[in-house]
């Protein structure tokens, strides 16, 4: 009886994990939140969208847009940007908070930002020299990782 209960619990756990594992759905750019569409028009006007998708998690929805240049932008449910990753180019200057841009130009003048992420705790910035800088929400540098 005990083995049967364990087996039933394992089957249930496996079933629920596979149900929520892959909830990605391709979408058109027009299905993105208006704020995200405006962000793309403003900061990536010459980029062509390769594809866009909506990712549903248990309690959250995010959007991802990948351009033909391999640059990528992730958006939150409300259309705010979460991550900008410009693999083969630099992140548009208007996206980078002024305090972070000033720090990078002062201490790393020969580099540029290729990726920036933000969440509820911090900003993470990746430079062309491979360094990753982490800032708190008040733009104080809190970590440097190579």
Can you name each region flagged by the protein language model?
Residues 1-24, 40:
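Bacterial Sec-dependent N-terminal signal peptides
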Residues 22-146:
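Interaction-mediating elements
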